[in-house]
Amino acid sequence: MKIAHPAFAGTLESSDLQVRIEPNNDGGIELVLDSTVEQQFGHAIRQVVLHTLDAMQVRDALVTIEDKGALDCVIRARVQAAVMRACDVQNIEWSQLS
């Protein structure tokens, strides 16, 4: 999927995260993470984000994550929502999101 414009998903409430995704003109995936639990779970959060982007075939994006202790399922859902908003997806391919 090609990121067409910046998009947000999520909140800054406890146990949630906010995802901002935008086109990366330099190419590739650039991930910026700010998390209250980065010391313990930063690597795992990055893995979930990168795996979700890969599953959605996103190759070029600047992704900024502000995490407040979100579970993996929340991270995955917020990243998926941000990608779909940034790509203006009208017909969702649900099998791609499992």
Curated annotation (Swiss-Prot):
Q: Which UniProt keywords apply?
A: Cytoplasm, Phosphoprotein
InterPro entries attached to this UniProt entry: CitD, Mal_deCO2ase/Cit_lyase_ACP
What Pfam family is a match for this entry? Answer: ACP
Is Phosphoprotein among the key words of this record?
Answer: yes
Q: Where mainly found?
A: cytoplasm
- Keyword Cytoplasm listed? The answer is yes
User: Where is this chain's protein located in or outside the cell?
Assistant: Cytoplasm
- O-(phosphoribosyl dephospho-coenzyme A)serine modified-residue sites: 14
What are the record's GO terms for cellular component?
cytoplasm
Looking up HAMAP family in the UniProt record yields: CitD (MF_00805)
* Described purpose of this protein according to its UniProt entry: Covalent carrier of the coenzyme of citrate lyase.
Q: How does it assemble?
A: Oligomer with a subunit composition of (alpha,beta,gamma)6.
Can you tell me which family this protein belongs to?
Belongs to the CitD family.
The protein's name in its UniProt record = Citrate lyase acyl carrier protein
Look up and give the organism this protein is from.
Answer: Vibrio cholerae serotype O1 (strain ATCC 39315 / El Tor Inaba N16961)
